[in-house]
A protein has these predicted regions:
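Charged, amphipathic alpha-helical stretches
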Residues: 1-64
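Conserved pre-motif I regulatory segment
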Residues: 61-157
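Conserved C-terminal RecA-like helicase domain
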Residues: 93, 122-124, 146-147, 162, ...
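Walker A/P-loop NTP-binding motif
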Residues: 106-111, 165-184
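Signature of the SF2 helicase/ATPase Hel1-core->accessory helical subdomain module
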Residues: 129-130, 168-177, 233, 237-374, ...
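Short hydrophobic/aromatic beta-strand immediately N-terminal to the Walker A/P-loop
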Residues: 155-157, 191, 385
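Conserved Walker A/P-loop ATP-binding site and its immediately adjacent core
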Residues: 167, 183-209
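Conserved helicase motor
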Residues: 197, 217-224, 236-241
């Protein structure tokens, strides 16, 4: 029978390492493993200083499976120990959500197998790839085999807001612990690689909060007394092929480093940063964290580069808690995309922008109506954001020849000054027929502002709205 030709793959279909760990628990997907773990009651420790999630996971193991309860206990005690260490100076101790705990547990399992016998791990991954993964209808079947050289790179595809930074801190300790147990070669440096100086400063403060020795990278410190004793933070723009006034040659770091990469593909053009990471970890190891691996691959215009990146992250991604899982668990945001047919229609533009303000007002009224929203869920007051493509430059779509930011400021000025006109827009938007239609003939805002239409907005508010927004 002829081999079925697959269409262009998506990264989520190619996460063979992630599924290799899942099958050790007898599960084919994250939902099957986590179904009974999501209750917040399972967060934190029991009276025996063991993770409650560890005990729940023990119930999922089958007697003849590859993982034992003793192994899970060993891994859990590492996680508990390292969590205690980063909690030492915190007023509010960290309690891992199920997806954070599983990220750390998967890391324990992987590092144990990697340090114990990398050749055996490589063999087991390839056997799983050929005997299981490539026979699933929902997976991508064209990944190349693993080599031992592939194994010193791990990636975590975790959504923004899911706690990637705290995982990084524990990952450092996990790697150091297994390197100690297996008498691995001493690391030259521990490096956190960021896309910019702002994120470098943020990592510095967060590592300090986790009670970890940390320093901002300095050219003068290369080869200095404190080399390897602290986590060093450097943004990718300070690395170069040769030394410069503000840059240091990547060769100066040697190759036996532990490198932790935060959103690396956002910091340097092309694949330069990936080459630097490769040089930094030739004899070492790297952990990489991003919410946008899939988008980064799709953005590659060169087919060869896209495939290389696709294969690399397909084989390196240890845990997938990307946005679809994040959203399904009740995090993230609901959104609507409403494109305007004609940017040059002032009446249409005013209607759309007024609708935006009305939406913000509606959310604010609901927020103020019940303080339990804040007290129980720690939700802050709604925030409105305008995102434009230009601050100084003139937007080509804009007939008034002003920047996007100026356009919004002019709208807000008109909104405040012309109360009668914009009160009319508000009344139209709150009526059953606003006059705006989609291409299919449906009302654009017909199903919007249901809370206001249902009574949150009294008649006096319609007049006060223009004054107080």
């Amino acid at each position: 029978m002829a081999k079925k030709i697959q269409k262009k793959g998506k990264l989520q279909q190619a996460l063979v390492l992630f599924h290799y760990i899942l099958q050790l628990f007898g599960c084919k997907d994250l939902e099957a493993l986590s179904r009974d773990l999501k209750d917040p009651a399972y967060e934190g420790l029991n009276d025996d200083h063991e993770s409650k999630l560890y005990h729940e996971l023990c119930h999922k193991l089958y007697a003849t499976g590859p993982l034992s309860i003793e192994q899970l206990y060993f891994y859990d005690q590492h996680i508990v120990k390292f969590t205690d260490e980063i909690n030492e100076k915190r007023s509010e101790p960290i309690k891992w959500k199920y997806f954070q705990y599983l990220s750390l547990l998967f890391t324990e399992i992987y590092l144990d197998q990697y340090f114990s016998n990398p050749q055996a791990l490589c063999h087991n991954l390839n056997r799983f790839l050929h005997d299981d993964f490539n026979h699933r209808a929902e997976t991508w079947h064209e990944l190349p085999d693993f080599t031992v050289d592939d194994l010193n790179k791990l990636a975590y595809w975790n959504a923004t807001g899911s706690g990637k930074t705290l995982l990084m801190h524990v990952n450092i300790k996990q790697y150091q612990e297994y390197a100690r147990i297996h008498h691995a070669k001493k690391l030259n440096r521990i490096i956190v690689l960021t896309p910019n100086e702002g994120l470098s400063r943020q990592h510095y403060e967060e590592l300090k909060a986790s009670n970890m020795d940390v320093a901002m990278f300095s050219k003068q410190g290369v080869g200095g007394l404190f080399q390897g004793k602290a986590v060093e933070i450097i943004d990718i723009n300070k690395l170069a092929d040769k030394d410069g006034d503000k840059t240091v040659a990547v060769e100066a770091f040697e190759g036996n480093n532990l490198v932790l990469v935060d959103e690396g593909h956002k910091g340097s053009s092309g694949d330069v940063w990936m080459g630097y990471r490769q040089k930094l970890t030739e004899e070492g190891f790297s952990f990489e964290y991003s919410a946008t691996f899939g988008q980064a691959i799709s953005a590659k215009s060169n087919a060869k580069d896209r495939k290389a990146m696709f294969d690399q992250y397909g084989k390196a991604t240890l845990f997938d808690y990307s946005y679809r899982y994040f959203y399904a668990d009740g995090y993230g945001k609901d959104y609507r995309i409403m494109n305007m047919n004609d940017w040059n229609d002032d009446d249409l533009l005013n209607m759309y922008l007024t609708a935006y303000l009305l939406c913000l007002y509606e959310q604010t009224k609901i927020y103020q109506s019940d303080m339990r929203i804040h007290n129980r869920f720690l939700v802050e007051k709604p925030l409105g954001i305008f995102v434009g493509s230009s601050v100084k430059a003139v937007s080509k779509e804009n007939k008034n020849q002003v920047s996007d930011v100026t356009q919004i400021l002019l709208f807000l000025q008109d909104f405040i000054r012309n109360r009668t006109e914009f009160s009319g827009y508000i009344r139209r938007l709150l009526s059953s027929e606003d006059g705006l239609k989609t291409k299919n003939g449906y009302s654009v805002f017909g199903n919007s502002f249901l809370a206001l239409k249902g009574g949150y907005l009294v008649e006096d508010d319609k007049q006060k709205f223009a004054e107080n927004i």
